[in-house]
Amino acid sequence: MPEQNRILCRELSLLAFNRRVLAQAEDKNVPLLERLRFLCIVSSNLDEFFEVRMAWLKRENKLHPRRRLDNGKMPSETIADVTEAARSLIRHQYDLFNNVLQPELARESIHFYRRRNWTGAQKKWIEDYFDRELLPILTPIGLDPSHPFPRPLNKSLNFAVELDGTDAFGRPSGMAIVQAPRILPRVVPLPSELCGGGHGFVFLSSILHAHVGKLFPGMNVKGCHQFRLTRDSDLTVDEEDLQNLRAAIQNELHDREYGDGVRLEVADTCPAYIRDFLLAQFKLTAAELYQVKGPVNLVRLNAVPDLVNRPDLKFPTHTPGRLKALGKTASIFDLVRQSPILLHHPYQSFDPVVEMMREAAADPDVLAVKMTIYRTGTRSELVRALMKAALAGKQVTVVVELMARFDEANNVNWAKQLEEAGAHVVYGVFGYKVHAKMALVIRREDGVLKRYAHLGTGNYHQGTSRIYTDFGIITADEQITADVNTLFMEITGLGKPGRLNKLYQSPFTLHKMVIDRIARETEHAKAGKPARITAKMNSLIEPTVIEALYRASAAGVQIDLIVRGMCTLRPGVKGLSENIRVRSIIGRQLEHARVYCFHNNGADDTFISSADWMGRNFFRRIETAAPITAPELKKRVIREGLEMALADNTHAWLMQPDGGYIRAAPAEGESEADLQNDLWTLLGG
């Protein structure tokens, strides 16, 4: 195969992932309000796609227009391909909302009322709502030499209003801009009695369209057109000018709202001259214009399921399983001393991790606590426990990653609170994101210091621990806990990388470990020995790993990859990758665990990791991979993390050589296998 065709386009692969998510919104086996949630997830993902990936392609095209990307194409060619795919996905999305989901919701007495269908009573209520809730807040900006075109915030809802007449000062009118503050709901619920006893909603844009004239008394409103600008949201911090990372991040967060435009969304009814006017204001081309049939921000529909009390239209609730042994012992440390604890979230409760930190904060024998924070949410019992530990006089060290994309403001806030409580807060290593998920407790027992560690594949975030699938291990293994301590010393101090006993870390040893393990399986296959690689991750795009997998496949290694999102490897290509199979699991839970298993002559070397197989994870982040060696725990990780995923025939998508996906289905006579439901049955409470 030609060199330029060996690696697929990562942006097209990411859009393909969102097509699989959108398929959940089409699936009639998914409860109706959950289908609406999946539609919103796709919209949110697309926003981030334009803010990050499309923005990067634009910058690359500007700086290096002739440099070929990993997919063998130049940036301009890739932008054209990606734009076409994005347009197709967005059209599909709005068709689904307008022609499928809205009619099905209406049959369940859940209505989205358009202006032309408002009853007299609804019109009266909506006008009162506008006068009471919107009119005092909205600020129209007339465009003239003393009122230049305003800078809309990233992803904010705005309206271009065409006017006729003269204002109070005798100025001729032309156009004004109305910005809808973010505090306003984009979907407004109507009283039940106005909706025949059901649920009714109107879009904020419809309310404003109907009453925008009240913002311009005495003027004639000729047209009102909603628009939304998506901006480049990359944060850039100059290392040479850097004095205080936290202050620099706070400044950049403000600037992010006003980055370069990358996408302009307007309604499909917007006239051409208004579209052209807006494109000129934002220095965008027609290729960056997206006309949609409906509200320009479907993300805000995610409020609707929470406003509708219809359990029959939502997923049934599940209760995470709890460790029975934890209730039989006075201390989690006593339990972990006996044997390590493996947790598989959300099927098993995240509580043992929280309990470990709570107990550490209250235990007089605990001397020090260390933890990394990447994403932890706006409310965190874990961080509260760290603050209590610091206030109790314990040595508390917290590595807060301030550059966690779209969580920067939240992490800045936690860093301030932790410092005020007396914790030592460090911001990692400039130029490397601290993505490792690790915690360490140092406790005095019988006159000697004993260490306990937690290592995980997911964030210390109690909210996402109920949605994302992840593994975590709590252990007192002396070599692993010593390694975790070494990693904290590396991050917080200065010096050369320490020698690790069992853990592998990025950016120093993890990539080499993966390459070496693949090479070993390759040699075993060449020698006629059984050789197999099974791995699960969010993304696979690192070219040297992909080439190593191609070599392994050519040698006869059987390779099964479970890649939820981006995958730029081509599976099943004769002479290149015929022994590689790739599948993606898309279901109620977001598959987030990273698990690697290398057969190694039957030893089945198994690791859980914070790292995907991407260049950023191997070379620009601090990551960990921990071996799972206890026989029962290894058996669980292989079964729950890999084998059951490979058996799934209800939510699995099978990747094709061209980068497309086909949904798996049970063969004739084969029973259904549903990874996530089966794990709830196996592990849930």
Swiss-Prot record:
UniProt xrefs under HAMAP family: Polyphosphate_kinase
Active-site residue list: H435
Family indicated by similarity: Belongs to the polyphosphate kinase 1 (PPK1) family.
Species in which this protein is naturally found: Neisseria meningitidis serogroup A / serotype 4A (strain DSM 15465 / Z2491)
Pfam families: PP_kinase, PP_kinase_C, PP_kinase_C_1, PP_kinase_N
GO cellular component: polyphosphate kinase complex
Positions contributing to Mg(2+) binding: R375, R405
Cofactors named for this entry: Mg(2+)
Transmembrane region(s): none
InterPro entries: PP_kinase (IPR003414), PP_kinase_C_1 (IPR041108), PP_kinase_middle (IPR024953), PP_kinase_middle_dom_sf (IPR036830), PPK_C_dom2 (IPR025200), PPK_N_dom (IPR025198), PPK_N_dom_sf (IPR036832)
Gene3D superfamilies: Endonuclease Chain A, Polyphosphate kinase middle domain, Polyphosphate kinase N-terminal domain
EC number per UniProt: 2.7.4.1
Protein name (Swiss-Prot/TrEMBL): Polyphosphate kinase
GO biological process: polyphosphate biosynthetic process
Record note on modification: An intermediate of this reaction is the autophosphorylated ppk in which a phosphate is covalently linked to a histidine residue through a N-P bond.
EC class of the enzyme, as a word: transferase
The organism's place on the tree of life at top rank: Bacteria
Binding site for ATP: N45, Y468, R564, H592
Keyword annotations of the record: ATP-binding, Kinase, Magnesium, Metal-binding, Nucleotide-binding, Phosphoprotein, Transferase
GO terms for MF: ATP binding; metal ion binding; polyphosphate kinase activity
UniProt function note: Catalyzes the reversible transfer of the terminal phosphate of ATP to form a long-chain polyphosphate (polyP).
